[in-house]
Amino acid sequence: MAKEKFARTKPHVNVGTIGHVDHGKTTLTAAITTVLSAKFGGAAKKYDEIDAAPEEKARGITINTAHVEYETANRHYAHVDCPGHADYVKNMITGAAQMDGAILVCSAADGPMPQTREHILLARQVGVPYVLVFMNKCDMVDDAELLELVEMELRELLSKYDFPGDDTPIIHGSALKALEGDQSEIGEPSIFRLADALDSYIPDPERAIDQPFLMPVEDVFSISGRGTVVTGRVERGIVKVGEEIEIVGIRPTVKTICTGVEMFRKLLDQGQAGDNIGALLRGTKREDVERGQVLCKPGSVKPHTHFTSEVYILSKDEGGRHTPFFNGYRPQFYFRTTDVTGSIELPEGTEMVMPGDNIAMTIKLIAPIAMEEGLRFAIREGGRTVGAGVVAKIIE
């Protein structure tokens, strides 16, 4: 059976489980891999294998995350599950595991709890585009009215944070029953219903190569007789030789023409997402471009200085600050390839931020950066990472 080959042709989607502690996220993850692998191939993962999540580092922050994969009839999924609440917060803010959609797991016996709410808010803040719900432990609730009540609460909660609560798929089931091979409605069939909902509710993500061109500037060289070469890794899209591009951020935006693309000292017709290239720019002086700017498709990204964000502040144990900070704190914000100083404004009623906290705050930079909602950044003091954040809403 040439199964492998077939798998690669399926669209790939990144998802993850979110929700309150002990509502069954890891059990559901195990149930999905077990039930779907029996039908579509792939590897079943046991609860203990997922729960013993390995450590990884993202933006200088240590996060425990378990990665599993599974297939449905139409797609290949990569799925992340985190053991602890703090890991979720860090994961979502650093974008260590970018999610095209999230499965919110909520125990039918308990209903929405504080972390249920917090994870929905985080999903909204960090720009997870789709959330669907698995109402777990339905075997523990005999009262149909109670199930309806929990479902209503969940829909209201989703709507409150600007998700389409009324249209969100909510699947009733029991991850444990499904894992045990139970064939009743809340057993294995609930996992297939969840798989169908994932396939139909989360659209195919737009591939990086199909998005508008953007390349963060890492270095600038002057090559006599040829002009100025800007190097970096293409983040998304394609740049073709002869195309007009913009240089955005730090200084006023300028337009230029890309007159050449080279990679490994060879000339190419184009550079695309994932390529490390040197782009030759027409009529641009070496001192007109600097690290921290981006090359992009004209009009696709604007420079901004003022925005709201969701940030996670490293704890002392993670090598972060030992003391809290207050309103007006002025660290550096590291966007893509460079640091920019900025000041922070805490939400009303918040006096200070302790190491280990996550919080929504407004940031004002002293120089504009090419920015979109969902852009990740690090917070640094003298080159040392003290936090991580994501742009939630641009103000100006």
UniProtKB/Swiss-Prot annotation:
G3: annotated span: 81-84
UniProt entry tagged with the keyword Nucleotide-binding: yes
Segments passing through the bilayer: none
Record region (G5): 174-176
Primary enzyme class: hydrolase
Catalytic reactions on record: GTP + H2O = GDP + phosphate + H(+)
Region G2, annotated ranges: 60-64
The keyword Transmembrane is assigned to this record: no
One Gene Ontology cellular component: cytosol
tr-type G domain sequence ranges: 10-206
Pfam families, A to Z: GTP_EFTU, GTP_EFTU_D2, GTP_EFTU_D3
Region (G4): 136-139
Gene3D superfamilies referenced in this protein's UniProt entry, alphabetically: P-loop containing nucleotide triphosphate hydrolases, Translation factors
Span list, region G1: 19-26
Binding sites annotated in the UniProt record for GTP: 19-26, 81-85, 136-139
Subunit comment: Monomer.
Annotated function: GTP hydrolase that promotes the GTP-dependent binding of aminoacyl-tRNA to the A-site of ribosomes during protein biosynthesis.
Protein name: Elongation factor Tu
